[in-house]
Design a protein with these regions (language model features):
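Short S/T/G/P-rich N-terminal loop/turn motif that feeds into the first structured element of a domain
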Residues: 1-54, 61-73, 81-113
Length: 113
């Protein structure tokens, strides 16, 4: 079965990246419902302080499964909070069909660290 990788990129005003990263780190609790969405294989959030960007990278069973994130209200609410602070999103959020991969992609939907 082919996987789909969804990559969301959020650009933060330069002076706000540390605060934004902390908000994203703390948002893990309010976003735990993502783990219950059908088709999720793995999900992670990250920060690139040098480029003043946050990202969410997720792997799904299908494009339809990945597109659930476009309607997941807790994430939409979080995005509005970032937007109110001047953040901009790469739109439309791309969903990439995997052409090949090395290694295993998770499938339990459980958080990993």
């Amino acid at each position: 079965m082919s996987s789909v990788v969804r990559i969301s990129i959020l650009t933060i005003p330069e002076d706000g990246i540390d605060e934004a990263a902390e908000v994203m780190r703390k948002a893990e609790q309010e976003l735990k419902g993502i783990q219950k969405l059908p088709g999720l294989r793995t999900y992670c959030a990250g920060v690139d302080r040098a480029r003043s960007q946050l990202t969410n990278v997720s792997v799904w069973d299908s494009i339809e499964h990945a597109e659930q994130m476009s309607r997941f209200q807790p994430m939409l609410d979080l995005g509005k909070r970032f937007g109110a602070k001047g953040a901009t999103f790469l739109r439309l959020i791309p969903n990439f069909e995997c052409l090949w991969q090395w290694g295993e992609i998770g499938g339990s939907g459980n958080a990993w660290r």
